């Protein structure tokens, strides 16, 4: 698996990964209807803006299998193709995001987690920092100044 920066040619693949990950993994943490609404919310133009304006990294094994978006100190998105889940792709992408956040001078990483991904983030040192928002996303944070689960893990390039 290689990790590389996303570019404009990745937009459709990233949108497809996002949609399939949400529909495959969000239920039963949310209803099928809620998952459908979430999956259709961000179209390819949102992904194009993310690639242009933020750090977006893609995991590739011949084709794109996952991606992560970093906006300042925030992990704005992290999705892995359902056919590649539980193979460490998300962990490598999250480590890459944390490296990017640290390199930008931040000492804390922030994100909003869907209910189905909470355990993934908790196992990697994230803690809740507030109640869920109106859409059910939980605000999480991680101190990047101390060594903890998966910290210091250098992702493949």
Q: Which residues make up each language-model segment?
A:
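A short beta-loop-alpha structural element at the N-terminal edge
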Residues: 2-16
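Conserved GNAT-fold acetyl-CoA-binding loop/helix
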Residues: 19-45
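Conserved beta-hairpin
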Residues: 54-66
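A short, internal acetyl-CoA/4′-phosphopantetheine-binding micro-motif in the GNAT/acyltransferase core
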Residues: 75-85
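Conserved acetyl-CoA pyrophosphate-binding loop and the N-cap/start of the following alpha-helix
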Residues: 84, 88-96
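Conserved GNAT acetyl-CoA-binding A-motif
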Residues: 101-114
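Conserved catalytic-core motifs of GNAT/GCN5-like acyltransferases
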Residues: 110-112, 127-141
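Conserved active-site tyrosine of GNAT-family acetyltransferases
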Residues: 121, 126
């Amino acid at each position: 698996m290689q990790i590389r920066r996303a570019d404009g040619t990745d937009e459709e693949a990233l949108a497809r990964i996002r949609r399939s990950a949400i529909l495959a993994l969000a239920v039963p943490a949310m209803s099928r209807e809620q998952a459908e609404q979430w999956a259709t919310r961000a179209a390819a133009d949102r992904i194009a803006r993310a690639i242009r304006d933020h750090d977006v990294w893609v995991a590739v094994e011949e084709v794109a299998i996952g991606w992560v978006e970093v906006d300042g100190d925030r992990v704005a998105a992290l999705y892995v193709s359902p056919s590649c889940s539980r193979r460490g792709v998300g962990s490598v992408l999250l480590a890459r995001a944390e490296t990017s956040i640290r390199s930008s001078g931040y000492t804390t990483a922030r994100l909003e987690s869907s209910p189905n991904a909470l355990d993934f983030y908790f196992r990697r040192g994230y803690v809740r920092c507030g109640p869920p928002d109106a859409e059910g996303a939980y605000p999480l944070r991680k101190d990047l100044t101390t060594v903890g689960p998966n910290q210091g893990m250098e992702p493949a390039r």
